[in-house]
Amino acid sequence: MLIETYGLTKKYGKKLALNNVDIKIDRGQLVAYLGTNGAGKSTTINILTGLLKPTSGTITYAPNLKIGVVFQDSVLDNNLTVKDNLYLRAKMYKTFSKDWLEQLIELIGIKKFLNQKYGTLSGGQRRRVDIARALIDHPDLLFLDEPTTGLDLQTRLVIWNLLQKLQKQQGLTIFLTTHYLEEAENADQMYILENGNILAKGSASQIKEKYAPSKLRVKMKDNKPPLHSKTLKDNKFELDALDSSQVIDFLTKNKNQIEDFEYHKGSINDAFIKITGKELQ
């Protein structure tokens, strides 16, 4: 366990931003923290990183825990080069390893624009530098507050391939908030938040299984309903909670009786809408 909270609550006057939130972050996990705008995501990160005090509740940290944060808005200087920005930040730490910083530069792929001013970089390049800055002190836990917002799909994939590599090679634990739900599809632990309340939690697969089961719709030639199916219109029937192998098995066994079929694999987006009644935009 790296961080655990119990009854975490934050009020701004009469407004309740967080309401009795219980969170546990275990080492090596990808933790996805999802919610619409104003749900309380950034408030939670600010509290967990010590930038904001909770109104009530307790937070337990692992001994000697090191934390890195990639904020929505960069904290680096647009007028300094990438190299100067990183080395200036590195010197703020008591124990600064030049070897580790050079390794980071290679690992994250920012060597080509080290001598460019930070303010002249593309969105994806800036984000990579922001991640490097957050990893200078070799943190155990990296908080990412909507790290790919505003980036195109290709750049988002580059950033996520990088983060997965860091998690695998460095044993990094990641706490993620995001507007792109596909980035949370493989989360080890997920929390879905709305109006400061946690509505659902579990692994991504558990959340999908409970709130967004896959559906197979079939049209049978003889209009005979398959076992455990639900009857729809136009001689169609629906079967829930089948995984891919079960779908293939069913279609193979009944291929002579099936006129048409449609398979919808449940997603985090489906689960999110089911839980909150809203789309994440």
Region spans (language model):
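Short, charged/small-residue-rich alpha-helical element at the C-terminal edge
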Residues: P213-Q281
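Conserved ABC ATPase signature
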Residues: K117-L121
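Conserved catalytic motifs of ABC-family nucleotide-binding domains
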Residues: H138
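Catalytic Walker B motif of ABC-type/P-loop ATPase nucleotide-binding domains
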Residues: L142-D145
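Conserved ABC ATPase "signature" region
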Residues: Y87, F96-F113
